[in-house]
């Protein structure tokens, strides 16, 4: 089934300039809707983990998400005084208590998750936003005013602190999703974007900004890398001087590896889960 879906999506993607709400063939509509349903249920993912720091991106799934915006028109949605006009419905809209209990997810008002995102059992959504195509795994907390961007992949037992931004892939268009692996702690108001991978058990301090062009400086080795935080790193914001010493530019600094003291300060609180 997956290979047939992929073929339909790939063909539709090549013909996307000719697709519209009015003209799209039924087979394309059904394929895109099916992919979004599978994403919503967590049976299909935009990216799948192969090993620590190694992910396979399913580009055709991302293409299906993008095609959905071409195939669907804006509609009025909402409740009471809150009215919206959009192409993507709420993930939890229309669910009764039994259905919500069955998800195993705690959703604190006014948290929003769009349909086509997956939120695993034991996750907590404080007043936050989870975009289409995103995957939030078990035991993760998305704290107040945090944003999980389109198609971002968030691992198990992750804490995204208040105001954190995890970048999406839809605009500007990115090749791969931003990925936060298992047991990571992302400090308040930090931003991880542009397909950066934060490997498991890492701690990103408050107010750290990491994109593909951000220098990542390892204090222990003096090495500068881009686009990936190694497993078990503790990262803070910093600056590196220019070659002529006339100015400095922002960087992210790996100051040490996670130890017992770091873990004690950033461990998740089981009292808040369950």
Curated annotation (Swiss-Prot):
Cellular component annotations (GO), alphabetically ordered: cytoplasm
PROSITE patterns: HEXAPEP_TRANSFERASES
UniProt record, GO biological process: diaminopimelate biosynthetic process; lysine biosynthetic process via diaminopimelate
Cellular compartments annotated: Cytoplasm
Superkingdom assignment: Bacteria
Record carries keyword Acyltransferase: yes
Ranges that cross the membrane: none
Pfam families named in the record: Hexapep_2 (PF14602), THDPS_N_2 (PF14805)
Main EC class the enzyme belongs to: transferase
Annotated pathway: Amino-acid biosynthesis; L-lysine biosynthesis via DAP pathway; LL-2,6-diaminopimelate from (S)-tetrahydrodipicolinate (succinylase route): step 1/3
InterPro entries xref list: DapD_Trfase_Hexpep_rpt_fam (IPR005664), Hexapep (IPR001451), Hexapep_transf_CS (IPR018357), THP_succinylTrfase_dom1 (IPR023180), THP_succinylTrfase_N_sf (IPR037133), Trimer_LpxA-like_sf (IPR011004)
Enzyme Commission number: 2.3.1.117
Database matches in SUPFAM superfamilies: Trimeric LpxA-like enzymes
Catalytic activity: (S)-2,3,4,5-tetrahydrodipicolinate + succinyl-CoA + H2O = (S)-2-succinylamino-6-oxoheptanedioate + CoA
Entry's Gene Ontology molecular function annotations: 2,3,4,5-tetrahydropyridine-2,6-dicarboxylate N-succinyltransferase activity; nucleotidyltransferase activity
Keywords from the UniProt entry: Acyltransferase, Amino-acid biosynthesis, Cytoplasm, Diaminopimelate biosynthesis, Lysine biosynthesis, Repeat, Transferase
Family: Belongs to the transferase hexapeptide repeat family.
Protein name: 2,3,4,5-tetrahydropyridine-2,6-dicarboxylate N-succinyltransferase
Taxonomic classification: Bacteria, Pseudomonadati, Pseudomonadota, Betaproteobacteria, Burkholderiales
């Amino acid at each position: 089934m997956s290979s047939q879906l992929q073929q339909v999506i790939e063909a539709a993607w090549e013909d996307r300039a000719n697709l519209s709400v009015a003209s799209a063939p039924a087979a394309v509509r059904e394929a895109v809707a099916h992919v979004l349903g599978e994403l919503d249920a967590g049976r299909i993912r935009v990216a799948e983990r192969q090993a620590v720091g190694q992910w396979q991106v399913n580009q055709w799934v991302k293409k299906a998400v993008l095609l959905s915006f071409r195939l669907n028109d804006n509609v009025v949605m909402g409740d009471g005084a809150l009215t919206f006009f959009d192409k993507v419905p709420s993930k939890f809209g229309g669910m009764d208590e039994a259905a919500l209990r069955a998800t195993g997810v705690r959703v604190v008002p006014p948290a929003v998750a769009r349909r086509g995102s997956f939120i695993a059992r034991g996750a907590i959504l404080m007043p936050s936003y989870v975009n289409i195509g995103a995957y939030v795994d078990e035991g993760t907390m998305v704290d107040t005013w945090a944003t999980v961007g389109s198609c971002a992949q968030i691992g198990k037992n992750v804490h995204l602190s208040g105001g954190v931004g995890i970048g999406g892939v839809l605009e500007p268009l990115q090749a791969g999703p931003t990925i936060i692996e298992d047991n990571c702690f992302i400090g308040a108001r930090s931003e991880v974007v542009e397909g950066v991978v934060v490997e498991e058990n890492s701690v990103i301090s408050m107010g750290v900004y990491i994109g593909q062009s951000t220098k990542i400086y390892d204090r222990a080795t003096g090495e500068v890398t881009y686009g990936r935080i190694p497993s078990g790193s503790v990262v803070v914001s910093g600056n590196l001087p220019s070659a002529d010493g006339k100015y400095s530019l922002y960087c992210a600094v790996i100051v040490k590896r996670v130890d017992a003291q770091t873990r004690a300060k950033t461990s998740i609180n089981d009292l808040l889960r369950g």
